A protein has these predicted regions:
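Alpha/propeptide regions of enzymes that mature by internal proteolysis
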Residues: 1-329
């Protein structure tokens, strides 16, 4: 058992600046991040597991309509919601994930269910919802996930024949309105909407969890990096726990989360150096914008991003004061 414990979380990354939101909205984001941090950190403070801490922190963010996950999930091209989530236990490298769920209130709970109650790692679409329902997880009708802001974003995207990453400016396509391109060129002015958390508990165990609603106006059952173990989510007690946020296609191609772990394991790099290499030297040159939160086995925290901002927070037993930030410093 170690005396160290730490929790870090994020609520998305992208073109985020003081000019892009009102002071009131900024305070709402900071309060929501702080609340999720307090919930997860309280678990660690009483000797609870890293798994419980990251799950509860992510559930708090899923319940907040400000973030593109759970209740605040964006709309697909067809006007419904397809949510993804993943969780991983660094102690034994067990993992569970769901993709394309439409009814489960907290997708991260469904991901935990896959890990704990099945022999599988990734379940999707009606089958994943059915498993959640069978095990008594809270389910919600479509109107629970309706937010006016997200609906307005969908209407704008449909009218423009575009697809959006979270509640940002659109990704332009040359396809006709009735059939927008599945993977358009990236617009430099956007936000990537995902929530996630990583933790180290007093028992020396690491865990990671990630949840997202994906892209506004997405179709063809598009899946990003969030539910893919090793790309958007990863945890290994020997190295680190990682939760990513960004343009998922690039994070998938770069296998970001696992790459950071490998740099630490095979090259002996520190957490901060491994994160810097992947986020700034590997992702950025291929057009991958976004960031991540990470914690290592010693309780060191890293929150790198190559975008203009990232909703983020962390707290450690070594520095008990909570840290909450949005913009570049």
């Amino acid at each position: 058992m170690t005396n160290s414990f730490a929790l870090a979380l994020h609520g998305g990354a992208g073109t985020i600046s003081p000019q892009s939101m009102t002071p009131e909205k900024e305070q709402e984001y900071r309060a929501a991040l702080g609340q999720a941090l307090a919930i997860g950190y309280a678990v660690l403070g009483r000797g609870g597991s890293a798994l419980e801490a990251v799950e509860l922190a992510v559930r708090s963010l899923e319940d907040c309509p400000l973030f593109n996950a759970g209740r605040g999930a964006v709309f697909t091209h067809e006007g419904h919601h397809e949510m993804d989530a993943a969780i991983m236990d660094g102690r034994i490298r067990a993992a569970g994930a769901v993709t394309g769920v439409r009814s489960v209130q907290n997708p991260i709970r469904a991901a935990r269910l896959v890990m704990d109650k099945t022999e599988h790692v990734l379940l999707g679409y009606p089958g994943a919802d059915a498993l959640a329902r069978q095990h008594g997880l809270p389910m919600q009708p479509p109107e629970y996930f309706f937010t006016q802001q997200r609906y307005d974003q969908l209407q704008e995207a449909l009218a423009e024949g575009r697809m959006r990453l979270d509640h940002s400016e659109a990704l332009e396509t040359e396809a006709p309105l009735q059939e927008p391109a599945a993977f358009p060129n990236e617009d430099p002015k956007k936000k990537m909407g995902t929530v996630g958390a990583v933790a180290l508990d007093v028992h020396g165990n690491l865990a990671a969890a990630t949840s997202t609603g994906g892209m506004t106006n997405k179709q063809y059952s598009r899946i990003g990096d969030s539910p893919i173990i090793g790309a958007g989510t990863f945890a290994d007690n020997r190295t680190c726990a990682i939760s990513c946020t960004g343009h998922g296609e690039f994070f998938l191609r770069a296998v970001v989360a696992h790459d950071i772990s490998c740099l630490m394991e095979y090259r002996g790099l520190s957490l901060s150096e491994a994160c810097r290499i992947v986020v700034h030297d590997k992702l950025a040159p291929i057009g991958g914008e976004g960031g991540l939160v990470a914690v290592d086995a010693a309780g060191n925290v890293a929150l790198p991003f190559n975008s203009e901002g990232m909703y983020r927070a962390y707290q450690t037993s070594a520095d008990a004061a909570p840290f909450v930030a949005i913009y570049k410093e």
